[in-house]
Amino acid sequence: MRITVSGLPGSGTTSLSRYLSERYGFTMISAGEVFRQCAKEHNMELAEFGRLAEKDPAYDKMIDARQKEIAEKSDNIIVEGRLSGWMVENADLKIWLFAPISCRLDRIVFRDQIADVETAKAITLEREHCEAIRYQQYYSIDINDHSVYHLILNSEHWGVDDLGKIVAAAIDQLKKTPFAAS
């Protein structure tokens, strides 16, 4: 089974992906973690690294191509990333997580150890803007078009365990009556 988990920064995609990976024993690959690691390796903030990636498409395309290649050759995998629902066309279940910006910013401040919410907001909005432009330019993908997703969940009011239970119900149903991936 191939599952993609996508959403904007701070929506909980990495947490849910880890949960599902542990629960089902699936391999997990994460574009966000790869991107954050690359930024760190270049001694850059995420927004700064995003601007670099905006100038040189090789960064995004390398991460995206690698994820797609691994996912399409693998079974029992969770592919986490903003574009994974678009890139992994043969996924059995494509999930989009969303949460209001205030919720996402609180999570980002904690996760990335940013000094305050206003700083996190500036960084996050710039990052989202840069990414949206790149996705449109590179792949003609509108990140706000969720039509490829099978399951869209608001992560604001549920913790990862509760979200995991909702997704588990979908996975269990798919195991009973699989459908052709769209």
From Swiss-Prot:
Q: What is its EC number?
A: 2.7.4.25
Q: What is its main location?
A: cytoplasm
Instruction: Cite the Gene3D superfamilies for this sequence.
Output: P-loop containing nucleotide triphosphate hydrolases
- Is ATP-binding there in the keyword field? yes
Q: Where does ATP bind?
A: G7, L8, P9, G10, S11, G12, T13, T14, S15
Recorded superkingdom: Archaea
Q: Where in the cell is it found?
A: Cytoplasm
Tell me what reaction this enzyme catalyses: CMP + ATP = CDP + ADP; dCMP + ATP = dCDP + ADP
Of the GO CC terms on this record, one is: cytoplasm
Which keywords does the record carry?
ATP-binding, Cytoplasm, Kinase, Nucleotide-binding, Transferase
GO molecular function per UniProt: ATP binding; CMP kinase activity; dCMP kinase activity
Q: Where is the signal peptide?
A: none
Q: Which Pfam families match?
A: Cytidylate_kin2
CDD domains to which the protein is assigned, alphabetical: CMPK
Keyword Transferase belongs to the record? yes
Biological processes per GO annotation? pyrimidine nucleotide metabolic process
InterPro entries from the entry? Cyt_kin_arch, Cytidylate_kinase_dom, P-loop_NTPase
For this chain, the family text in UniProt reads:
Belongs to the cytidylate kinase family. Type 2 subfamily.
Q: What is this protein called?
A: Cytidylate kinase
Q: Which organism is it from?
A: Methanoregula boonei (strain DSM 21154 / JCM 14090 / 6A8)
